[in-house]
Amino acid sequence: MGTRLLCWAALCLLGAELTEAGVAQSPRYKIIEKRQSVAFWCNPISGHATLYWYQQILGQGPKLLIQFQNNGVVDDSQLPKDRFSAERLKGVDSTLKIQPAKLEDSAVYLCASSL
């Protein structure tokens, strides 16, 4: 108890904030019908210039769909551009949209960021 109180007091005195670090992504999960549209949103770690969207199909490793550096696209060679679109707003938040969705789009979609 005493050690925890001391650490808490030290953090307060240093002016440090206890925050949740990491990439924020929503929705956590989404189930839709074929031919419907779906959009995913990502907020990268503060200060990270590079943002990635990955698709991971069951039983496979993650596949890079698109990579942004600030506002610009670095690599979108694996993005199926006929139905998938992605943008990065003001070098911060990003959206990934699938319209219309097909059965083969069933996957986990992951967002990551780096310096």
UniProtKB/Swiss-Prot annotation:
Disulfide bonds: 42-111
Localisation: Cell membrane
Main subcellular localisation: membrane
Any single GO BP term: adaptive immune response
Signal peptide range: 1-21
Domain of life: Eukaryota
InterPro entries xref list: Ig-like_dom_sf, Ig-like_fold, Ig_V-set, TCR_beta_variable
Domain Ig-like stretches: 22-115
One Pfam family recorded for the sequence: V-set
GO cellular component: plasma membrane; T cell receptor complex
Keywords tagged on the record: Adaptive immunity, Cell membrane, Disulfide bond, Immunity, Immunoglobulin domain, Membrane, Receptor, Signal, T cell receptor
PANTHER family per record: T CELL RECEPTOR BETA VARIABLE 11-2 (PTHR23268:SF118), T-CELL RECEPTOR BETA CHAIN (PTHR23268)
Function (record text): V region of the variable domain of T cell receptor (TR) beta chain that participates in the antigen recognition. Alpha-beta T cell receptors are antigen specific receptors which are essential to the immune response and are present on the cell surface of T lymphocytes. Recognize peptide-major histocompatibility (MH) (pMH) complexes that are displayed by antigen presenting cells (APC), a prerequisite for efficient T cell adaptive immunity against pathogens.
Subunit and interaction comment: Alpha-beta TR is a heterodimer composed of an alpha and beta chain; disulfide-linked. The alpha-beta TR is associated with the transmembrane signaling CD3 coreceptor proteins to form the TR-CD3 (TcR or TCR). The assembly of alpha-beta TR heterodimers with CD3 occurs in the endoplasmic reticulum where a single alpha-beta TR heterodimer associates with one CD3D-CD3E heterodimer, one CD3G-CD3E heterodimer and one CD247 homodimer forming a stable octameric structure. CD3D-CD3E and CD3G-CD3E heterodimers preferentially associate with TR alpha and TR beta chains, respectively.
Name under which the protein is recorded: T cell receptor beta variable 11-2
Protein species of origin: Homo sapiens (Human)
